[in-house]
Amino acid sequence: MGSVSNQQFAGGCAKAAEKAPEEAPPDAARAADEPQLLHGAGICKWFNVRMGFGFLSMTARAGVALDPPVDVFVHQSKLHMEGFRSLKEGEAVEFTFKKSAKGLESIRVTGPGGVFCIGSERRPKGKNMQKRRSKGDRCYNCGGLDHHAKECKLPPQPKKCHFCQSINHMVASCPLKAQQGPSSQGKPAYFREEEEEIHSPALLPEAQN
């Protein structure tokens, strides 16, 4: 009995020894799951400064020229540069990238030889409210430049000339406006709407008294 058990134990050890080399080391299995980084070079095809992303036109991969070029996605967070990160259209770049379910995505983007990217001279534009106020619009209720009458926090103010802010006359008889002539007639429609709201009895209940 003992000799049979020893033989079975020895046989089991031999089979285990045969199976052991088939199992891959943990590090090798992990490396196989990670995406392989590839090297490319080319130019910036286009880049949206406001959204912070664009596409590279890869003209060479691992030193081998590509014809036609291949598009590679780029996000501003991957750009090697200081300050505001962006790319200029046609700017020469070198980069590492990977293959993903969405396509080719850049991992790190630099200028030729690993230098900083040049970037675009463009900067994101301000909000529409800032652009609107930069044209010299003012509140027709209090005369403030930082808001419109619809946004004014003050109660309805006494009627006054909306051109020179004088309370001695209305805009129709303003001498300063008359001196400017027809140039003052090109007032946008929303200016007239706000004037009508300021003059309306709903906003000026004291006018009914």
Swiss-Prot record:
A zinc finger (CCHC-type) spans 137-154, 159-176. InterPro entries: CSD, CSP_DNA-bd, Lin-28_RNA-binding, Lin-28A-like_Znf-CCHC_2, NA-bd_OB-fold, Znf_CCHC, Znf_CCHC_sf. The modification N-acetylglycine is found at G2. Residues 1-31, 177-209 are annotated as: Disordered. Expressed in embryonic stem cells (ES cells), spermatagonia and testis. Expressed in numerous epithelial tissues including the epithelia of the small intestine, the intralobular duct epithelium of the mammary gland and the epithelia of Henle's loop in the kidney and in the collecting duct (at protein level). Also expressed in the myocardium and skeletal muscle (at protein level). It comes from the Eukaryota. GO terms for molecular function: G-quadruplex RNA binding; miRNA binding; mRNA binding; pre-miRNA binding; protein-RNA adaptor activity; RNA binding; sequence-specific mRNA binding; translation initiation factor binding. Disulfide bonds: none annotated. Induction: Negatively regulated by the microRNA miR-125b in response to retinoic acid. Residues 39-112 form the CSD domain. The modification Phosphoserine is found at S3, S120, S200. Residues 113-136 are annotated as: Flexible linker. RNA-binding protein that inhibits processing of pre-let-7 miRNAs and regulates translation of mRNAs that control developmental timing, pluripotency and metabolism. Seems to recognize a common structural G-quartet (G4) feature in its miRNA and mRNA targets. 'Translational enhancer' that drives specific mRNAs to polysomes and increases the efficiency of protein synthesis. Its association with the translational machinery and target mRNAs results in an increased number of initiation events per molecule of mRNA and, indirectly, in mRNA stabilization. Reactivation of LIN28A expression enhances tissue repair in some adult tissues by reprogramming cellular bioenergetics. Improves hair regrowth by promoting anagen in hair follicle and accelerates regrowth of cartilage, bone and mesenchyme after ear and digit injuries. Monomer. During skeletal muscle differentiation, associated with translation initiation complexes in the polysomal compartment. Directly interacts with EIF3S2. Interacts with NCL in an RNA-dependent manner. Interacts with TUT4 in the presence of pre-let-7 RNA. Changing M81I: Erroneous subcellular location. No positive effect on terminal myogenic differentiation. The CSD domain is required for function in muscle differentiation. The CCHC zinc fingers interact with the GGAG motif at the 3' end of let-7 miRNAs precursors, more generally they bind the 5'-NGNNG-3' consensus motif with micromolar affinity. The CSD domain recognizes the loop at the 5' end. The flexible linker allows accommodating variable sequences and lengths among let-7 family members. Keywords: Acetylation, Cytoplasm, Endoplasmic reticulum, Metal-binding, Nucleus, Phosphoprotein, Repeat, RNA-binding, RNA-mediated gene silencing, Zinc, Zinc-finger. Pfam families: CSD, Lin-28A-like_zf-CCHC_2, zf-CCHC. This is Protein lin-28 homolog A. GO terms for biological process: cellular response to glucose stimulus; germ cell development; miRNA catabolic process; miRNA metabolic process; negative regulation of glial cell differentiation; negative regulation of pre-miRNA processing; negative regulation of translation; positive regulation of cell proliferation involved in kidney development.
